[in-house]
């Protein structure tokens, strides 16, 4: 079955027909064909995509990406620990909110949604507060589309011997990185993002030695990261609780298609081409980006809403959907915006078609 429209969102996103077709078969969760030949292969492939170093392991977790963020924060910090969170968007704020719900000691550095983290403030905070044990940041903050300075963040954190937690939900698989070279302890991402699978589970790629120190720290039964890893390690990929089999099989197919595309580097280049073509085309139609180009990621871009009193996002959305494209509302608290993603099964020719569609559905007076 073909899609009626293209999802220009940061995930869930448009998937290939072959990824969707992979879900048409049922699987038994205790069968070796599923656990050894699919789950274990996925775990191995993900680690190899993340780093060339051998001291990392992978845990798959049922649920949304946020569930795995909560599993990580709730499983790796002991009662005497303290978390520092960088919050320059909704997803950084969500990590701080998770820490609050878990009654964790937490300090938040919040430079604002359109501002990059203040690295000098991060350095001084770590220097002046020795109680901080863990630091967390979102790599690609899809609230705005900003790409945060991952290398500098990791360098500063490790200079102070802190455990690093990176939400790479919307970057892993679409932006090249080696988490071993960056010395990241825990990196979290999701099936329905740049690997181009479907929703249903997320995953954590962790330094095995650091993860092994987390036994008994979890504040939740189902979100116990260590227990999930231990079960998979000792039982050839078996999940502790019901595995989302169809989603997992689709993800396996998505990984094969990433390899066929040429790997993360080639996919990143496609995303970059998509994003640059998108921004150029939108500016030609009179739209303005929220962020300067230097801060953009190749994942999703925020645009200011037109100033015309005739403009209404919902109407714009409905007209574009009828033309075959679905976009995203804004999430910035202090600016009226909307967002357009360019990841997933999206190619430069799709962006060309989008520009034609937007030009055709503009019903408001465009400012000169």
Curated annotation (Swiss-Prot):
Keyword field: Aminotransferase, Pyridoxal phosphate, Pyruvate, Transferase
Record's keyword annotation contains Transferase: yes
Root EC class: transferase
Modified residues (N6-(pyridoxal phosphate)lysine): 193
Catalytic activity: (2-aminoethyl)phosphonate + pyruvate = phosphonoacetaldehyde + L-alanine
EC number: 2.6.1.37
Gene Ontology molecular functions: 2-aminoethylphosphonate-pyruvate transaminase activity
Entry annotated with the keyword Transferase: yes
GO biological process: organic phosphonate catabolic process
Co-factor(s): pyridoxal 5'-phosphate
Protein family per UniProt: Belongs to the class-V pyridoxal-phosphate-dependent aminotransferase family. PhnW subfamily.
NCBIfam families from the UniProt entry: PhnW-AepZ, PRK13479.1, transamin_PhnW
UniProt subunit comment: Homodimer.
HAMAP family: PhnW_aminotrans_5
Function: Involved in phosphonate degradation.
Stated name of the protein: 2-aminoethylphosphonate--pyruvate transaminase
Gene name linked to the record: phnW
């Amino acid at each position: 079955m073909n899609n009626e429209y293209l999802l220009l969102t940061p995930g869930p996103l448009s998937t290939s027909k072959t990824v969707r077709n992979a879900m048409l078969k049922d699987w038994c969760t205790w069968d070796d064909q599923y656990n050894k030949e699919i789950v274990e292969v996925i775990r191995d492939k993900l680690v190899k995509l993340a780093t060339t170093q051998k001291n990392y392991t992978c845990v798959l977790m049922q649920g949304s990406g946020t569930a795995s963020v909560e599993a990580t924060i709730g499983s790796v910090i002991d009662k005497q620990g303290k978390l520092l969170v960088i919050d320059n968007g909704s997803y950084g704020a969500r990590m701080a909110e998770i820490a609050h719900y878990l009654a964790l000691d937490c300090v938040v550095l919040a430079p604002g949604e359109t501002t990059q983290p203040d690295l000098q403030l991060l350095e001084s905070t770590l220097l002046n507060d020795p109680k901080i044990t863990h630091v967390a940041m979102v790599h690609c903050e899809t609230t705005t589309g900003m790409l945060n300075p991952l290398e500098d963040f990791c360098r500063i954190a490790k200079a102070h011997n802190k455990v690093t937690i990176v939400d790479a939900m919307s970057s892993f698989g679409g932006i090249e990185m080696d988490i071993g070279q960056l010395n990241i302890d825990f990196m979290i991402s999701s099936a329905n993002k740049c690997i181009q699978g479907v929703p249903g589970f997320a995953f954590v790629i962790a330094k095995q030695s650091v993860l092994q120190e987390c036994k008994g720290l979890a504040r939740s039964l189902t979100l116990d990261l260590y227990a999930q890893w231990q079960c998979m390690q000792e039982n050839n990929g078996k999940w502790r609780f019901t595995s989302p089999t169809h989603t997992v099989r689709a993800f396996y197919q998505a990984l094969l298609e990433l390899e066929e595309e040429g790997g993360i580097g080639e996919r990143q280049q496609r995303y970059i081409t998509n994003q640059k073509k998108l921004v150029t085309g939108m500016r030609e139609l009179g739209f303005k980006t929220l962020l300067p180009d230097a801060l953009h990621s190749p994942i999703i871009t925020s645009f200011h809403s037109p100033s015309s009193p005739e403009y209404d996002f919902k109407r714009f959305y409905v007209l574009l959907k009828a033309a075959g494209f679905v976009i995203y509302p804004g999430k910035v608290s202090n600016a009226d915006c909307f967002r357009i993603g360019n990841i997933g099964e999206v190619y430069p020719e799709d962006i060309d078609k989008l520009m034609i569609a937007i030009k055709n559905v503009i019903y408001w007076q465009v400012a000169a």
